[in-house]
A protein has these predicted regions:
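Residues forming the ATP-binding cleft of Hanks-type serine/threonine protein kinase domains
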Residues: 79
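Basic, Lys/Arg-enriched alpha-helical interface segments
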Residues: 1-57, 68-74, 83-86
């Protein structure tokens, strides 16, 4: 399997910077691993969205797009579960 490039969109980067320190290291580790496995165990495809997925990190969610043609994972949102789908 070939490796995917991972990009973090500007809005998601700002959300990442605002994460509590206890969550930040775990989030970065999970995001980096998406380059090797963009659909890890436990990820879910979001209903009503084309190619949009989410992974769970405790009470936090990382929402991302997968472009299999370009081999690209784009992180679009990182937020607490109560806020992420607004």
């Amino acid at each position: 399997m070939s490796k995917y490039a991972v990009e973090v969109k500007l809005a998601a980067r700002k959300e990442l910077d605002g994460l509590p320190d206890t969550v930040l290291a775990r989030a970065v580790r999970h995001i980096e691993s998406l380059g090797d496995l963009p659909r890890p165990a436990g990820c879910k495809k979001l209903k009503g969205y084309r190619d949009q997925w989410r992974i769970r990190i405790g009470d936090w969610r990382v929402v991302y797009l997968i472009d299999d043609t370009l081999k690209l994972v784009s992180i679009v949102r990182i937020a607490h579960r109560r806020d992420v789908y607004e």
